[in-house]
């Protein structure tokens, strides 16, 4: 007797359709008008290791280190309120204007130099590279004064949203932990803000939460979070607003090899070594196996600089090809090749002989920037498809353009009182429309306002002349040669020359 059985093969249905992300080149029309904008000389001076506070709530001297991120929030003028070269360039009823970043140069002042970082009480037990003898067990306090030069990093990252960083932080444990247990680690993402510490060679992690001894790393990152740009996340971002492009150069080598003092939370398993004989110079008590190096960025040279050079954006890595939504640009910079820490000495008491106590020593670090941009004027036609796409991407863009999208019909009945000032009803004065909040107001950036620094005379600026040269364009001459006219004379012809005669 034959029996029918259904097929055991699984049936795979096609995935549901999703909205496709398109490039800005599909709906942004570029014009032939370019503008130059540059900041003034941007300076920052402070202490390279920590913030100086006179009172708990008042900062006297900020922390300014060559190992910090500098994040500039560049404000641009609204092109829809901009004085345009042609009145018929666009139709304000059906079109809107936007800026596109096509050129950039980050200028750095100050000489090249290497700044030292360190800790007067660093957890440094033994020299594990050239140990002359097998070290005995650690004492109660083996901390020493150690300084080092850190990893060398140069970074320039541009987008219309802040860059995203990653670091390892303390995660939530599944069960209760005892004192001294290793906390679970969690990869965390956060916005890179101005003043955040970059990776200096000790990893991207939250040192204040994961190193409670305050003796494991140098002073400048001890109570901080070292962040590393999450290039994978920003590259995979759907619209490509966080990163148009980036320039990066990193190098590091190991200078010294040490180990750390302390009780090993996870001792070396006994099956990984053979025990020493009795009395073998203390080798039955294993030394600390928590090894770590001191980093070094090696030589600093002008041949390997990514700054003070122009860069042109032809095609961005994401779908946003340089369009500055919200009329702003976020520029993230790291440059450890100019991290010189200046020593300042002030006299306390003047004597004929030298005494170190007669002087006070101070540390300062100074940074100098000059930012130049080339922007292209673009226009967008407000069709139904384009407006729907932009509303899905970021509805705040349409709000800034004063373009409203009709909301769906509401099924609720709203109340409207006749006498608003009447005391017989609840107070209507407290019912106010919510103000529009800046989505980045909770973060710290270096504000740079270029609203009044746009110029169409590209040949009057260094970056503008470079742009004209690489684009094969020539500026129109400002001066025209004027032909000199002959002066009018009363005589119609010049007098004839006298002939020479022979005698």
UniProtKB/Swiss-Prot annotation:
Residues 479-503 are annotated as: Disordered. Keywords: Capsid protein, Disulfide bond, Host nucleus, Host-virus interaction, Late protein, T=7 icosahedral capsid protein, Viral attachment to host cell, Viral penetration into host cytoplasm, Virion, Virus endocytosis by host, Virus entry into host cell. SUPFAM superfamilies: Group I dsDNA viruses (SSF88648). GO terms for molecular function: structural molecule activity. It is found in: Virion; Host nucleus. One of its GO terms (cellular component) is T=7 icosahedral viral capsid. Signal peptide: none annotated. One of its GO terms (biological process) is virion attachment to host cell. This is Major capsid protein L1.
